Amino acid sequence: MRISRERYFELYGPTEGDKIRLGDTNLYITIEKDLIAKGDELVFGAGKTARDGLGLLPNVREEEVMDLIITNVVILDPLLGVIKADIGIKDGLIVGIGHGGNPFTMDGVNFVLGSSTEIISGEGLIATPGFIDTHIHWVAPQQVFDALSAGFTTLIGGGTGPAEGTKATTVTPGSWNIKIIAESLDYFPLNFALTAKGSSSRITMEEVLRNGASGFKIHEDWGAMPRVIDETLTVADEYDVQVTIHTDTSNESGYLEDTLNAINGRTIHAYHVEGAGGGHAPDIIKICAEPNVLPSSTNPTKPYTIHTYEEHLEMLMAVHHLNPKVPEDVAYAESRIREETMMAEDYLHDLGAISMMSSDSQAMGRVGETGIRTFQLAHKMKDLGLIQINDNERVLRYLAKITINPAITHGISDYVGTLAPGHIADIVLWDPRFFPVKPYMVIKGGAITWALMGDTNASIAYAQPVLYKPMFGYYSAKSVSFFFSATDGVENLSKIVRRRVLPVKNTRHLTKKDMKYNDILPKIEVNPDTYEVKINGIVPKVPPSKSLPLTQLYFIY
């Protein structure tokens, strides 16, 4: 029996060769492969195939079948590509990408379903890995709600609340503070990794690693001198943890070359490499050309628009406790905000030379906008046409910046960052019309945790008003979420929190070549007087955007 492509779409969703528009952007992904056997699709509902003896195998033990299946969904994943498949989940892990069902009645079955299996209908939806934000200032715990509502399931950073140190730096200093923050975050259904203060004090750094820190943050507000950089990286190398750095904007203790000499070829994650978020003025962006540096942006400068420059001056003064009545403070702020480097940053992202995107939450950036701004930038750069790549490659390049590359960088890619089998089932489902603004459902560790839900006194699930609400997985945080810690701190952190603690690993021998879709090492030159940036000998012309997709249309209500 043959049916039209249009009819197939109505019944089972798109298939191989179909194109899907993402939100109201100019980006159209194309399904590269459909892993589901035609004619044997599993569909839930009255008169459908997901019934006992049909798509569900009877008389089979629980351990032999999936706990959960997401059917006929389009998978958008930096390792798997753009494919159509079922997703099989067991014990909170993804165990199958392919075709689920009953092998006695269906062809091409990769994993078995039975009466113990729950079903989420994925027809017409997109599944991505849960997004990862590597630049979280723990100013307020309520950021968790905004992160979930934007598709984020793993947050990496530091802080203690609205203290001056936290409003400026992603640092949880000292073991006592780590204990307090870990106990507090234990009630929220996301994965967390806490960064402690990088310093010249070895004993202090070893103490925090033994008590649950996952790595270090070097920040100029606490001191980013060459001695601090060297000692922090020395300890990190011994304990296999990552170091993030916000370098010395005022060049007080050295210039970019001095920082690179202190780093001495060792792996480091460089934050907000454009410089508006902080870093050697005016040429920190040149760090993107270093093979041992894993570079990221923060979202306030992305994409560069007609309002970006003006917004940043006042924002910077507030975040870094600067006094507008002190000329030196004003000069410091103005040295960090440069339109020329913002333009270059847009181009470097599209080129694949900046490997990650993050928020800098409540400390210049917005935790709920990282996904939006990432794909606004992809839209803008496709529109400009400076780099000619197909939409699948461009979308996967930008998706990798907020999924697998942050996971690799921080030593947690064995657990999160992809939907590949063996990883934690942190899955975000999207209606393509709302990607990547508002997820349809967030699945955390195999449990539905955050979702759109209607009036709970109504007769059906989606009676107005439909709002994001915590689901049962939210209240089972200890079962579905994880802390990530230095190996030496796993045991002690496990005594503080209820949930499992997993070790970070394989962070110290990474290079830019380990960054998926984002491993380019261009030649970068910065004019110290005009701030003009040349990339591979060319000044890219990236004008500020006057309008963007994924904006007011999605926030009328």
UniProtKB/Swiss-Prot annotation:
Substrate binds at H219. GO terms for molecular function: nickel cation binding; urease activity. It catalyses: urea + 2 H2O + H(+) = hydrogencarbonate + 2 NH4(+). GO terms for cellular component: cytoplasm. It is an enzyme of class 3 (hydrolase). Pathway: Nitrogen metabolism; urea degradation; CO(2) and NH(3) from urea (urease route): step 1/1. It comes from the Archaea. The active site is at H320. The modification N6-carboxylysine is found at K217. It is found in: Cytoplasm. Ni(2+) 1 binds at H135, H137, K217, D360. Carboxylation allows a single lysine to coordinate two nickel ions. Keywords: Cytoplasm, Hydrolase, Metal-binding, Nickel. InterPro entries: Amidohydro-rel, Metal-dep_hydrolase_composite, Metal_Hydrolase, Urease_alpha_N_dom, Urease_alpha_subunit, Urease_asu, Urease_asu_c. Its EC number is 3.5.1.5. Its cofactor is Ni cation. Its main location: cytoplasm. Binds 2 nickel ions per subunit. Signal peptide: none annotated. SUPFAM superfamilies: Composite domain of metallo-dependent hydrolases, Metallo-dependent hydrolases. Ni(2+) 2 binds at K217, H246, H272. Residues 130-557 form the Urease domain. Belongs to the metallo-dependent hydrolases superfamily. Urease alpha subunit family. NCBIfam families: PRK13207.1 (NF009686), urease_alph (TIGR01792). This is Urease subunit alpha. It comes from Sulfurisphaera tokodaii (strain DSM 16993 / JCM 10545 / NBRC 100140 / 7). The lineage of its organism: Archaea, Thermoproteota, Thermoprotei, Sulfolobales, Sulfolobaceae.
